[in-house]
């Protein structure tokens, strides 16, 4: 069963403390931009997988291999474990998926959606925590707000 509002609201934790310095953010951006990009897809709600839907998502993505940025993954895991300990208390927490680096060009977007096991490697899906990190300085672009679904959406 998928939690519905308002139950799922208790599952949201937010930090305003930076995980990365501006220099570390730039290193992640540089790595993400250097990797092979693919047109981002969406789950499409079918068991056979995902597809491209330009009405839901227009962006490119790449996957940052664990071995190529171990310090980044260490910092992400530290933050994830702290959030889990402070808010959720899940057992057996570990990073199981590489970080998805998403690049939005002007006019790019990702409409309302629910995160899941985007790599499709875990059956049944085991993602317990989903994280979003803003790497770009928000004064350098318009839009891009991360919004959570509210009643009626």
Question: Where in the sequence are the language-model features?
Answer:
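Fe(II)/2-oxoglutarate oxygenase catalytic core
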Residues: 1-153
């Amino acid at each position: 069963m998928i939690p519905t509002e308002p139950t799922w609201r208790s599952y949201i934790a937010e930090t305003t403390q930076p995980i990365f310095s501006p220099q570390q953010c730039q290193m992640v951006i540089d790595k993400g931009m250097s990797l092979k990009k693919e047109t981002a897809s969406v789950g499409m709600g079918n068991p056979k997988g995902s597809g491209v839907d330009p009405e839901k998502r227009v962006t490119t993505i790449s996957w940052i291999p664990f071995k190529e940025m171990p310090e980044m993954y260490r910092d992400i895991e530290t933050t994830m474990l702290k959030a889990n300990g402070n808010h959720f208390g899940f057992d057996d927490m570990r990073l199981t998926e590489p970080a998805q680096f998403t690049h939005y060009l002007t006019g790019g977007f990702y409409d309302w959606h629910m995160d899941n096991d985007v790599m499709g490697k875990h059956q049944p899906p085991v993602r317990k925590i989903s994280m979003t990190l803003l790497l770009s300085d928000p004064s350098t672009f318009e839009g891009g707000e991360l919004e959570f679904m509210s009643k009626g959406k």
